[in-house]
Amino acid sequence: MIKEAGAIISTRHCNPQNGDRCVAALARVECTHFLWPMCIGEVAHVSAEITYTSKHSVEVQVNMMSENILTGAKKLTNKATLWYAPLSLTNVDKVLEEPPVVYFRQEQEEEGQKRYKTQKLERMETNWRNGDIVQPVLNPEPNTVSYSQSSLIHLVGPSDCTLHSFVHEGVTMKVMDEVAGILAARHCKTNLVTASMEAINFDNKIRKGCIKTISGRMTFTSNKSVEIEVLVDADCVVDSSQKRYRAASVFT
């Protein structure tokens, strides 16, 4: 729901009265906080706001609240910052220019520009990990990184894709969270919940018919939490000329 709310407001903003029609594609999810659980029977309220635009991207801040329909009580359950890029409807490989947003104060633009530069640097710093491959280890020792490693393989079908036959970002995020959950449960031997996601980078699009390999490994543990790195690789089985590539990565 958070991803869809951001996509709606971003697509509305990047389609002016005159010009090429485009759709907003999710490029990065900043640190996502899971503050409170949402219970069965509660109503979810999702609100999205555009807080900054650069030449080719837009920053959206999304809050999710839960409402108890019996008592009327509301509480903030999730909040996240997302970055979208406008892709042309006629050529999805073409990134269009983003219309500017009107700020109430000059400080808002300056703060947004700082956040933009920060996330851009972070994306560049994580690019060196794009060559990493999580290799399985035979008979690993318990309570080691190799022992907790987990992977899932998924064939991308039509129900996973958009109108342009590319995978929905939310589908990839769901499977990444499942891999992290399996890995954490294997290490801790108990049920766990996701507390936060540091950042998800969507580096490349995944087409219908590709095989996704989602791999996870532990990078740090404390007394009450674990940090997990999840990587998504894609193999295009219908096009043998295209090599395996890194599609997304996250620390959770």
UniProtKB/Swiss-Prot annotation:
Keywords: Cytoplasm, Hydrolase, Lipid metabolism, Repeat, Serine esterase
GO cellular component terms, semicolon-separated: cytoplasm; cytosol
Reaction(s) catalysed (UniProt annotation): hexadecanoyl-CoA + H2O = hexadecanoate + CoA + H(+)
Tissue: Expressed in all tissues examined. Up-regulated in nasopharyngeal carcinoma (at protein level).
Domain of life according to the entry: Eukaryota
GO biological process, alphabetically ordered: acyl-CoA metabolic process; fatty acid catabolic process
Signal peptide: none
Major place of residence: cytoplasm
Span of domain HotDog ACOT-type: 1-90, 146-252
Pfam families according to UniProt: 4HBT
PROSITE patterns per the UniProt record, alphabetical: HOTDOG_ACOT
Catalytic activity, EC: 3.1.2.2
CDD domains the record matches: BFIT_BACH
Annotated compartments: Cytoplasm
Keyword Lipid biosynthesis: no
UniProt GO MF annotations: carboxylic ester hydrolase activity; long-chain fatty acyl-CoA hydrolase activity
Subunit-level organization: Homodimer.
Role noted for this protein: Acyl-CoA thioesterases are a group of enzymes that catalyze the hydrolysis of acyl-CoAs to the free fatty acid and coenzyme A (CoASH), providing the potential to regulate intracellular levels of acyl-CoAs, free fatty acids and CoASH.
PANTHER family in UniProt: ACYL COENZYME A THIOESTER HYDROLASE (PTHR11049), CYTOSOLIC ACYL COENZYME A THIOESTER HYDROLASE-LIKE-RELATED (PTHR11049:SF29)
Disease tied to this entry: A functional variant in the transcriptional regulatory region of in ACOT7L cosegregates with disease phenotype in family affected by nasopharyngeal carcinoma. The variant creates an AP1-binding site that significantly enhances binding of AP1 to the promoter, resulting in up-regulation.
Name by which UniProt lists this protein: Putative cytosolic acyl coenzyme A thioester hydrolase-like
Gene that this sequence comes from: ACOT7L
